Structure formats: C-alpha cells, structure tokens
C-alpha cells in the first residue's frame, strides 16, 4: 500500500472531516493547524489570531484506492473558493481556504484543477483559494478530532450555513 498525504484548509475543520472520512481509501483525517509561526499552537491561540495558523485537515490516503486529484475535486465542493477571508460564518485568516501542497505533482494537480474551476463558470467571482507549500502540521486537541461523531447536534448547527450554500452552489 502506497500512502500519501493531503492538507486542506476550508474554514472550520470540524466541517471538513466527515466528507473525506467517508471516502474509500482514506486512512485517517486529523483536524489541526498549519501555516503559522508558533510551535504547538492551541485552539485558543489560533482562534484569537495569535499564531498565524489556519485550521486544516491532514488526510492520509491509499493512493491505489483514491487519487489526490479526486481529493482536490472533493475539496472544491466543500468550500466557497471565492471567499479569501474565511468560510461561511467563520471569518478571519485562520479560516481561509488553502490547498497545501507537498510536491510538484500535487502543485500541478491543484493549479490545473483551480484553473478548470475558474473556467467552468460555476462562480461569478474569481477563485481565490490559495495554493501554498505545506508547512508543519500540528494536530488539534483531542476534543476536536471526530467532532461530528462526538457532537452531532453541535456539528449540525455549526455547519448549517455551509451545507445550505454548498447544496445550492453545487446542485446547479
């Protein structure tokens, strides 16, 4: 089995876990922080914009069962790629949309996919999701891991605006 890693930021990490976890070939999805300048950041620090980190998910996958390309395509359907200042009700640089790439192949796939999305005409505004080189990923505190399973009512409430937008946008 050949494993690979993908890191995506798309707003609150709670809402990014379930759609990836449900795919065949996904070995793990970890909520965490990346892109900042503080070692071992905490949720409270990131939430208060003290670290420069972005909430993200780290996905370990079996690339013989699922491709990086298919993960990028799924990622687009989980975000508003026209909003650089957060996602849905979550505002600020710690919620900005980013595809973090580990190598030239991931960068090529992400950039081509972004260009295809822009050319598709699905969005009236430009696609502003960043594509950046991966930095150290710090797993979030345990209570954030698998949040949608541990707290289904809180998860449903916190993700409602996101789900409403995505259903409307991607069912065109």
Swiss-Prot record:
Its EC number is 1.8.4.11. It catalyses: L-methionyl-[protein] + [thioredoxin]-disulfide + H2O = L-methionyl-(S)-S-oxide-[protein] + [thioredoxin]-dithiol; [thioredoxin]-disulfide + L-methionine + H2O = L-methionine (S)-S-oxide + [thioredoxin]-dithiol. GO terms for biological process: protein modification process. One of its GO terms (molecular function) is peptide-methionine (S)-S-oxide reductase activity. The active site is at residue 12. Pfam families: PMSR (PF01625). Keywords: Oxidoreductase. SUPFAM superfamilies: Peptide methionine sulfoxide reductase (SSF55068). It comes from the Bacteria. InterPro entries: Met_Sox_Rdtase_MsrA_dom, Met_Sox_Rdtase_MsrA_sf. Has an important function as a repair enzyme for proteins that have been inactivated by oxidation. Catalyzes the reversible oxidation-reduction of methionine sulfoxide in proteins to methionine. PANTHER family: PEPTIDE METHIONINE SULFOXIDE REDUCTASE, PEPTIDE METHIONINE SULFOXIDE REDUCTASE MSRA 2. HAMAP family: MsrA (MF_01401). Belongs to the MsrA Met sulfoxide reductase family. This is Peptide methionine sulfoxide reductase MsrA 2. It comes from Lactococcus lactis subsp. lactis (strain IL1403). The lineage of its organism: Bacteria, Bacillati, Bacillota, Bacilli, Lactobacillales. The gene is msrA2.
